[in-house]
From Swiss-Prot:
Gene3D superfamilies: Vaccinia Virus protein VP39. S-adenosyl-L-methionine binds at residues 44, 69, 96, 118. Substrate binds at residues 122, 154, 191-194. It catalyses: guanosine(46) in tRNA + S-adenosyl-L-methionine = N(7)-methylguanosine(46) in tRNA + S-adenosyl-L-homocysteine. Transmembrane segments: none annotated. It comes from Shouchella clausii (strain KSM-K16). This is tRNA (guanine-N(7)-)-methyltransferase.
Length: 213
């Protein structure tokens, strides 16, 4: 993905501390205090431009959402989208997924969303895939006992890798789809990439996974 650099992004993000949390480590274990109402907490890693995040937040107002994004220029677009929708149940973090343990406490998150992440197709880059064992270890620590991971991708190789990685890690699956848009899942909210790929007739792969006790 080619990113357009926006040198002003950092300054603009800092102007919205109530939406883009500037020192998220200070809220570790107390994220519900950042929202108007204490509700279940769903986290999207690699939130991109925020289309999925805002769509979910509108559809499920009784859930609090946090979008995590490492690229400031992309996060700026997400911030503008959340502001335009005036969503009280959304916060944004400028963080890398590898830093999640710094900002969330154990058993604090109810659900993780991983949507259309970089497939890192080369074998030597497997550890960078967000469904690799090193990231699953992080998610497991942060999820509540009945917490879930919802994963979507257009990349068949990454999907097969993720099924194997999660299965080897001892996870259980449900609602696995090899062609999401033919599955009749009514509550599906599409990402920017999902709209693009589905318009070309490409299948979207999806799964829900939980960690066994």
């Amino acid at each position: 993905m080619r990113l357009r650099h926006k040198p002003w992004a950092s300054e603009e993000l800092a102007k919205r501390p109530n939406l883009v949390i500037q020192q998220p480590e200070q809220h570790k274990g107390n994220w519900n205090n950042c929202f108007c109402t204490a509700q279940p907490l769903y986290v999207e890693v690699g939130t991109g431009k925020g289309k999925f995040l805002t769509g979910m937040a509108k559809q499920f107002p009784s859930i609090n959402f946090i979008g995590v994004e490492r690229y400031e220029s992309v996060l700026l677009t997400a911030m503008e989208r959340v502001e335009a929708e005036k969503l009280p149940n959304v916060k944004l973090l400028h963080k890398d997924v590898a830093q999640l343990l710094e900002v969330f406490a154990e058993n604090e998150v109810d659900r993780f969303f991983i949507n259309f992440t970089d497939p890192w197709p080369k074998k030597k880059h497997a550890k960078r895939r967000l469904t690799n064992e090193r990231f699953l270890t992080i998610y497991k620590q942060l999820l509540k006992q009945d917490g879930e991971i919802h994963f979507k991708t257009d990349n068949q190789g990454l999907f097969e890798y993720s099924l194997h990685s999660m299965s080897t890690f001892g996870m259980a699956f449900k609602n696995v789809s090899l062609n999401l848009h033919q599955s009749g899942m009514e509550e599906n909210v599409m990402t920017e990439y999902e709209e693009k790929f589905s318009a070309k007739g490409m299948p979207i792969y999806r799964l829900e996974a939980t960690f066994r006790p």
